[in-house]
């Protein structure tokens, strides 16, 4: 069995495949750049790819493709209609990286509050006065608006509340009462 990946997955995932499959990691989100490598691919794991990148031509370049797996929850990068017509199931990994995505969002928010990127660049140049040029601020008692309180939005809200932030949420599927249970004020 041959498994092709647009890019490497986590070590735990690779360990599950060890000894069970030949693995080709393309390190390229554009399968058209390596169609010749897909000829005998049985499974295609898509981590990152442009919208529609896994198209009919990509699928047909393998004479043995049995499944397309997309890490995450979106199907944007896969032409699901063509896969369905070709009898190739497309699967996703819902929930697998929810916490990581939420933590990444919080990390970016904290980096912005402290001007981390610009400060890092300037301090590496020896410009220590950047601290005075751009004022950093604490997020405590600041307000965070979260649009969409699905699984990831709820985790972000929980983390923000843990940072003593006020959280306002907009979600057409949750009532004011449901949001209040999360500690979120409905927008």
Residue ranges and their predicted role:
Residues 31-34, 55-58, 135, 183-184:
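Acidic, amphipathic alpha-helical patches
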Residues 12-19, 35-36, 78-85, 174-182:
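Short loop/helix-cap segments at secondary-structure boundaries that form the rim of catalytic
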Residues 24-29, 49-51, 124-132, 181-187:
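Short gly/ser/thr-rich secondary-structure transition/capping motifs
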Residues 23-24, 90, 167, 186:
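Hydrophobic beta-strand scaffold residues
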């Amino acid at each position: 069995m041959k498994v092709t990946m647009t890019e490497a997955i986590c070590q735990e995932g690779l360990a599950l495949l060890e000894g069970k499959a030949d693995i080709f990691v393309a390190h390229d989100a554009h399968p058209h750049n390596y169609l010749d490598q897909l000829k005998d691919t049985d499974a295609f794991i898509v981590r990152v790819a442009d919208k529609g990148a896994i198209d009919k031509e990509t699928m047909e370049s393998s004479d043995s493709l049995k499944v397309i797996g997309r890490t995450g929850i979106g199907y944007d990068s896969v032409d699901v209609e063509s896969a369905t017509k070709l009898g190739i199931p497309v699967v996703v990994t819902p929930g697998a990286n929810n916490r990581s995505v939420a933590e990444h969002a919080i990390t970016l928010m904290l980096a912005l509050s402290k001007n981390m990127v610009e400060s890092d660049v300037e301090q590496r140049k020896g410009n220590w006065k950047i601290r005075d040029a751009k004022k950093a601020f604490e997020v405590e008692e600041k307000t965070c608006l979260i649009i969409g309180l699905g699984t990831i939005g709820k985790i972000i809200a929980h983390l923000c509340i843990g940072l003593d932030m006020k959280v306002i949420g907009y979600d057409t599927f949750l009532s004011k009462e449901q949001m209040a249970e999360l500690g979120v004020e409905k927008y």
